[in-house]
């Protein structure tokens, strides 16, 4: 009965979001601008756990292209605030922390912030409309695009190209919501990206684990291709200062141990669901204009963070200040607070320490292996 009541309450608050957030303003102001055009890309990945990225030490070549990008900034200690898309992505689009979850229904999100700061804003999604808080926050963007099947993420880059070729705006924010590594994994990439084989569509069972992992790793390899090509495109733009921030919404279980857990969104978490891939890239013109932000990002590569940092990092990348924004939560700020407590939003919408999310000794060993302290 408690869960039914909570679900009903969430539905009502989501339904009334337009009313409860109507008068909210960030009172946004820009403290600096770059000469020429400014383009900011905020890319939300799907189910991309860090353990299966070559950039994080994985022994398979799942990042053959990004591994060749010398000016990439890889954040190595980022945990998701929720192991479900419908909770994680709203937090990624919002300034709200898990400790103040009720504020989610009263504050607007990243598109509204950039609108106030004078940007042209786009939300381009490779997922279906959610009919929930993701839509409420995302639909403040001035332009919305939902991609139809086959829903390969490279189609997002096609849309980015069209926007930047056609738009006359000098200040643009593009938020991309990827399909990434959403199950079924073998459907997330064209067949020419089936590098690890066999990757057949099989029943979920321990005896099929290798095929499932092969397909999952192929999806990560395709994400690698998408991100690398996106960076190449941004790099090619003349007279443009650009910055890109990527992070997955949550991780994934792949029948990793004796628990034989698969997928995500379970009431209790695992290290595999919590530890996510996140990275940033800055164009040469951006680096010249904002060397202190780039230096801070590089200094914070190993800083402990959660997906709460993403909103504040993106705002700070664009030199936007205002209500509810914090430099102490921005990974491109020398003021970033490495000592801030990290909290997870549990099934009851309570902020709890990660150690109290049902983690077992095998999870703590995984975190130890990656140098992560909870």
Regions found by a protein language model. Give the residues of each.
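Catalytic domains that recognize anionic headgroups
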Residues: 1-374
């Amino acid at each position: 009965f408690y869960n039914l009541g909570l679900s009903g309450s969430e539905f009502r608050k989501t339904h009334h979001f337009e009313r409860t957030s109507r008068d909210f303003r960030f009172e946004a102001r820009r403290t600096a601008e770059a000469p020429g055009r400014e383009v900011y890309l905020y890319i939300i990945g799907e189910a991309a756990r860090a353990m299966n990225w070559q950039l994080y030490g994985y022994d398979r070549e799942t990042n053959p292209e990004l591994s060749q990008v010398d000016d990439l900034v890889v954040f190595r200690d980022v945990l998701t605030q929720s192991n479900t898309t419908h909770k994680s992505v709203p937090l990624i689009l919002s300034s709200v922390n898990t400790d103040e979850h009720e504020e989610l229904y009263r504050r607007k999100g990243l598109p509204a912030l950039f609108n106030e700061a004078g940007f042209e804003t786009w939300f381009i999604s490779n997922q279906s409309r959610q009919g929930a808080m993701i839509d409420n926050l995302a639909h403040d963007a001035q332009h919305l695009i939902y991609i139809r099947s086959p829903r390969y993420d490279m189609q997002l880059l096609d849309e980015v190209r069209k926007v930047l070729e056609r738009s006359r705006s000098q200040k643009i924010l593009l938020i991309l919501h990827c399909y990434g590594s959403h199950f079924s994994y073998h459907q997330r990439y064209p067949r020419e990206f089936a590098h690890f084989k066999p990757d057949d569509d099989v029943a979920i069972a321990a005896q099929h684990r290798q095929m499932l992992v092969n397909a999952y790793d192929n999806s990560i390899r395709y994400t690698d291709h998408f991100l690398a090509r996106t960076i190449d495109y941004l790099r090619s733009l003349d007279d443009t200062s650009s910055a890109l921030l990527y992070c997955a919404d949550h991780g994934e279980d792949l029948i990793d141990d004796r628990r034989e857990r698969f997928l995500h969104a379970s009431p209790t978490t695992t290290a595999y669901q919590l530890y996510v891939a996140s990275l940033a890239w800055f164009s040469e013109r951006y680096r010249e204009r904002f060397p202190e932000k780039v230096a801070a990002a590089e200094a914070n590569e190993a800083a402990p963070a959660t997906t709460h940092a993403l909103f504040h990092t993106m705002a700070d990348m664009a030199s936007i200040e205002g209500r509810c924004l914090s430099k102490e939560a921005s990974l491109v700020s020398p003021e970033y607070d490495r000592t801030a407590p990290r909290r997870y939003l549990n099934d009851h919408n309570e902020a709890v320490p990660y150690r109290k999310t049902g983690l077992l000794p095998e999870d703590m060993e995984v975190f130890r292996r990656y140098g992560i302290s909870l």
